Amino acid sequence: MKMLTRLQVLTLALFSKGFLLSLGDHNFLRREIKIEGDLVLGGLFPINEKGTGTEECGRINEDRGIQRLEAMLFAIDEINKDDYLLPGVKLGVHILDTCSRDTYALEQSLEFVRASLTKVDEAEYMCPDGSYAIQENIPLLIAGVIGGSYSSVSIQVANLLRLFQIPQISYASTSAKLSDKSRYDYFARTVPPDFYQAKAMAEILRFFNWTYVSTVASEGDYGETGIEAFEQEARLRNICIATAEKVGRSNIRKSYDSVIRELLQKPNARVVVLFMRSDDSRELIAAASRANASFTWVASDGWGAQESIIKGSEHVAYGAITLELASQPVRQFDRYFQSLNPYNNHRNPWFRDFWEQKFQCSLQNKRNHRRVCDKHLAIDSSNYEQESKIMFVVNAVYAMAHALHKMQRTLCPNTTKLCDAMKILDGKKLYKDYLLKINFTAPFNPNKDADSIVKFDTFGDGMGRYNVFNFQNVGGKYSYLKVGHWAETLSLDVNSIHWSRNSVPTSQCSDPCAPNEMKNMQPGDVCCWICIPCEPYEYLADEFTCMDCGSGQWPTADLTGCYDLPEDYIRWEDAWAIGPVTIACLGFMCTCMVVTVFIKHNNTPLVKASGRELCYILLFGVGLSYCMTFFFIAKPSPVICALRRLGLGSSFAICYSALLTKTNCIARIFDGVKNGAQRPKFISPSSQVFICLGLILVQIVMVSVWLILEAPGTRRYTLAEKRETVILKCNVKDSSMLISLTYDVILVILCTVYAFKTRKCPENFNEAKFIGFTMYTTCIIWLAFLPIFYVTSSDYRVQTTTMCISVSLSGFVVLGCLFAPKVHIILFQPQKNVVTHRLHLNRFSVSGTGTTYSQSSASTYVPTVCNGREVLDSTTSSL
């Protein structure tokens, strides 16, 4: 005990020396409120703002100072009148001004510990007559302290009070440092630590996608630790800090102007996050007004919903988003405060200064050239609005009272007065066993819900709940409007928010990318990017990645996904289809007409001489070639694809097999006549039909094997240069389709060779010549078709149309060169369709190397066509 006393005396000496020096330095005249009681609570409030230059204290702080001070007095009055809370115990107060400075607050707080340092043990000091020593000017013994306001003040005071085990409850200090119980083990607060607020602010930025912002913090624990917590939360959400500024304690206008100039150096950081004390916030907004700078402010509860901060600079603050601790107004305090005036409030030595400042008048005769205050002036709803932390001041006083009440009930169970065990308070026991365990419903709160419960967590912190305000101009009047709240999660009414430029501002290092662009982040920087356009066939998997939709798919309009492209193919109503189909129909009609004419005149000499069996086969092939146009225009399907593969080669094989059989027959007959050979074999109609069918069968077998090895089907085909179009095609390559015509090409070549060999037939015996014309023209068509087919491979419409027209032209060549002359004679020159001379093949005789005829005129008769029974004179038919 003696060792402790010596330590306390030593501490007193050290503090007293510094304290007396400070008094001398500042010509100090103490203002304080001292109201005696059984238990006394200390109070620290920023009644004056910090001064400028050499002055410690500045103007009266109307809201954070006077209102909060009166809130403590109001709470003390209510508790002393309460019959259930500390009945029989009167609470007193000792309230001091901090002048919004931590160093000044520390000097003031020495008054709270003087009682502990100067307390004399009565048992050790007695008078000779046995009586105890009389102690004069004994300082009030402080049971606990309510305050301070700023975190820097509370930290300094907490370091002092912990030495003397005096519990402390703050109503506004939110620095995260104060949650460290190893250093601030007698500190509690009715407000949450700043890291909750920092998290809420970061979530607001992320909500509006503000990823590149500037920050300004007040020097000291509130601003520095708050902005540090915000930066940690910002990093977790990929939010970058463009520039981080700090406002010192000098409170010089130039420093605020300098900060604004620095903020303007980052034009893309349109949002500025403020973790500042109220006076610093006011000066910064004023500096922005002087510079005519426009920012979107996101401010902590240091700004909150205070009118004094934006007074005179409302246009600069318009659109600001501010946070304020969630609280309910104490209506009973409104009535109490509005009843005060300088004539009935004598216990508050600062109230007269407050009154003069608020109403811009003087309570003395024309002091400072001001008008004399009217005695009818009053505080009312037109000039008063309850400060946002009044509830927390009241809750702090009641929390201390509830802790003392429980301690008194425990230590003094048989009395409502203070027993000896309570006269010397054990601060450690009061804090840990009672204060941290209190749990009660906030007084004067009409809502009896979970949000109205007052309690502390294991770190002595209050619960984290915030209101979000937006500074607006409605009907020409500026005001704060609550637009959301935060309690672990953010809830915002975006439609209620007003912005300075009537739209949600952007605050990003780089300009937003267009809807079809992705962000390419710059190395080492998570907030700056360049915009790279996605390819037309890519969608945005996220804002940093363009992904290929894949073949046959295309990105949606909003580029959030892909959809299957519709299959494109030639439709019957397309111009690409109408032309080929018209040509094919015309050709098919011509073919039918020729067949009709031939059938009707089937037994006439001309039809017989033409080799009618091969003619019908040839006409069937021509008709089939016209049908191919319909197969190529039709929508691809497995059946259509099979018919295409089977029909294309087969139609040509039928035509050219018939022509090859015919030209081969002519060539063999003339070779026989010229060489005097015996009658050629296999020149009868049936033989020629079988030869022709055999040639056709080869093609059918080849195509059948092809269909078996490669089953017909469809495929979705996309050209690399035309990804937006999906073509529905048969599942064969164009090259495979042409390879399948190899056999037909061989037939064409052989036909052409035979036609060339028989080109010197007698002039009046010229069917071979017409076959030659047919083959030459066919070769020209196909030589022209092949390059066009391959060159137009990128446009399936042109390619298909070219194929259809080429096939139809091949049919027209056969009809025009071979059948048109015959039809013309049959219909318009029937006199030529007769028999005048006949030469039987059995009259051939072979002698030597030549062939002779029994008639002397035989040399003037040359067979015109292959016919196993007879050869007609050319005078019968020129064909």
Swiss-Prot record:
Tissue: Detected in brain cortex, thalamus, subthalamic nucleus, substantia nigra, hypothalamus, hippocampus, corpus callosum, caudate nucleus and amygdala.
InterPro entries: ANF_lig-bd_rcpt (IPR001828), GPCR_3 (IPR000337), GPCR_3_9-Cys_dom (IPR011500), GPCR_3_9-Cys_sf (IPR038550), GPCR_3_C (IPR017978), GPCR_3_CS (IPR017979), GPCR_3_mGluR3 (IPR001234), GPCR_3_mtglu_rcpt (IPR000162)
Membrane topology of this protein: Multi-pass membrane protein
Compartments where found: Cell membrane
Intervals, Cytoplasmic compartment: 600-613, 665-688, 757-769, 829-879
Glycosylation sites: N209, N292, N414, N439
GO terms under cellular component: astrocyte projection; axon; dendritic spine; glutamatergic synapse; plasma membrane; postsynaptic density; postsynaptic membrane; presynaptic membrane
Name of the protein in question: Metabotropic glutamate receptor 3
Gene that produces this protein: GRM3
